[in-house]
Amino acid sequence: MAGNGIFISFEGSEGCGKSTQIRRLAAFLQTLGREVLILREPGGTPIGETIRHLLKHDKNAAAMTPEAELLLFAASRAQLVREVIRPALEKGMVVLCDRFLDSTTVYQGVARALDSSDVAAINSFAVGELLPDLTLLLDLDAEEGRRRAASRGEPVDRMEQEDAGFYEAVRRGYLDLAREYPGRITLIDASLDEEGVAALISNKVSLRLEGQAHGVI
């Protein structure tokens, strides 16, 4: 956390409802008088959005190696942290980010099976000392997540084309992270209906904001 701002990241596999819940939380925070900035990864800056297209939609992306993928995600994040996130936090804003470094730890480090120490070093280089004050992990059965994602009827990007085994590994990786960092990562049951998930999130964030007001985070 910097200034009076607070940095909240949302994590989870495909179809878990992150985008919907980010919008709902933003609306809730605005009713409390907080200034909110919504970001996504990769993306959030002109450079980041170019990298996003390359990672997800470029015609040559199918040939991308896991190592190149890791470095591109890190490049987008490094730009986002310095160009957008840190300045917003210094202004006292609440930053809501759709994915952050935990996605890289899980997708590239676990599901792509890259060396965990290499992934950690690259993550650290990209973000410096900046970590989310709170990470909301929307946990959902991998097959249910794939079903929900498919039901949206939207074009499928390169990452969403991975097989069931890939997304089972993603979920396991996230749950391991939640056990490793219980003070930062809060597990949210994304199998609940939209209202139920939103209530869990708003309650958790309200508690964190109260803690911030009393100087305990």
What residues fall within each predicted segment?
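NTP-dependent small-molecule kinase module
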Residues: A2, A26, E143-I217
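A glycine- and Lys/Arg-enriched "phosphate-lid" helix/loop adjacent to the NTP-binding pocket
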Residues: S103-R172
